[in-house]
Each structure stands twice: as C-alpha cells, then as structure tokens.
Amino acid sequence: MPRVKTGVVRRRRHKKILKLAKGFYSGRRKHYRKAKEQLERSMYYSFRDRKQKKRDFRKLWIIRINAACRLNGMNYSTFINGLSKAGIELDRKILADMAMNDAAAFSAVAASAKAALK
C-alpha cells in the first residue's frame, strides 16, 4: 500500500485555522500552533461572554431605572413593586430606555406605580 502524505489535508486545515485567526496579534495570526491555541481560548471567551453580556445589560438597566426612580422620589424596589401592583408589564430594557430618552413618560409610569402602592 502506498504511503499517503497529508499535504492537501494539512494545508486546508491550517488555512482554515489561520483564516479564523485573522486580526490576532503577531505570531498568533501567523503561526499555526499559536493561532490554534489562541483561537481555542478566544472561542472559550466568546462563549463565556455571551452569557456575561446578558447579566451586564440587566445590571445597566437596573442602575438607569434606579437613578430615574430616585428623581421621582422612590427607589428601585418600591418602583418595581408598584409596577406589579398596578399591572404594568414593561420589561427593564424598555423602562431603562424610557428613563434615558423619555423622562416625561417615565415620570407618568412612576406616578402610576406610586399610586398603586397607596
């Protein structure tokens, strides 16, 4: 049986890895082994940070809502409690956007939440 050299297969595999490593720094984009190691690490980071991104945005929305609530004379937890009692089903993303871009509408929502607490 003749000896099979891995020329075409190896070149294809290396090209695939080096193409994915485009934009990496120095030898991490030029050398196959370093590129492969860095690519494995970067895939791990991207998987982990897709989960982290959701938590970070939720934190940011809560901070923005809390700041707007304090301008309306209440804190975040009482505001959320008032919203649930008033039957207002707006998510934190929408509330944070209202707090940043439409303060009058947020004040109206805060007033209705405050009224539901009484």
Curated annotation (Swiss-Prot):
The record, for SUPFAM superfamilies, names: Ribosomal protein L20
Annotated GO CC locations: ribonucleoprotein complex; ribosome
Taxonomic superkingdom: Bacteria
Keywords from UniProt, A to Z, are: Ribonucleoprotein, Ribosomal protein, RNA-binding, rRNA-binding
Pfam families (alphabetical): Ribosomal_L20
Which biological process terms from the Gene Ontology are attached to this UniProt entry?
Answer: ribosomal large subunit assembly; translation
GO MF terms, alphabetically ordered: rRNA binding; structural constituent of ribosome
List the transmembrane segments. none
- NCBIfam families (UniProt xref): rplT_bact
Q: What does this protein do?
A: Binds directly to 23S ribosomal RNA and is necessary for the in vitro assembly process of the 50S ribosomal subunit. It is not involved in the protein synthesizing functions of that subunit.
User: Which family is annotated?
Assistant: Belongs to the bacterial ribosomal protein bL20 family.
Provide the protein name: Large ribosomal subunit protein bL20
The record lists the organism as Sulfurimonas denitrificans (strain ATCC 33889 / DSM 1251)
**Phylogenetic lineage:** Bacteria, Pseudomonadati, Campylobacterota, Epsilonproteobacteria, Campylobacterales
